[in-house]
Amino acid sequence: MKLLFVGDVVGSLGREMVAQYVPKLKKKYKPQITVINGENAAHGKGITEKIYKELLQAGADVVTLGNHAFDNKAIFDFIEDATKMVRPLNYPTGVPGKGIVYVKCNDKEVAVINLQGRVFMNTLDDPFAKVTEAVEEARKRTPIIFIDFHAEVTSEKQALSWYLDGKVSAVVGTHTHVPTNDARVLPQGTAFLCDVGMTGPYNGILGMERDIIITKFLNQLPARFEVAEDDEGQLSACLIDIDEKTGKAKSIQPIRITPDAPFFE
């Protein structure tokens, strides 16, 4: 089984890249399931029902979120009905939405879990404790478990991947918007990538307008960041090949589409 995961979609340009290239990626690589992180899809912060449906129409089977999940209040109008969307599992009890979703793929089920880190981020419940419980329950239904770990620091992401090695199919990081060069399959069969990168503006800073951020570094004054909409696009993703019987990963392949590395069908 092949799983395609597309990193943080940022703004309208990110959505355009998804609409343009995800169908082409699915045609080329033939993944059985496609997961897209959409937490920055609504002008850099949050998601709306319209955008959620756009991502599904473009080919997503599941949409994951992160620390900006609730930045756009529109999410409260549809999150409980969004059966293919997951917010971080380790939000406190009672927060709307769910942190795990199961997707049917032929005669198999795939569990998709969204987690948020705690180092240099808002302090949610312990992701290690929460995911332990969730994985134990998920493995009663399926050995194929994918985790989008939305976290800031590399050490926390690495620690979680080693902690779960052999228990889940993959742990792939999001949030920093910068792709890392450490894709590997750990000894017990868990695929790992510290950060898959972002999908959206290519010449901005983490997808935002450069000048605003540079000025903030120079004068240390508060500034409102804006998505770099008038820009060239990039898409960051990874393709994971998973053994359907054992749930163990066989390989993980980063995918990058940029003006410097165009897509070839």
Could you say what each language-model-derived stretch is?
Residues 1-265:
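Acidic, metal/ion-coordinating pockets
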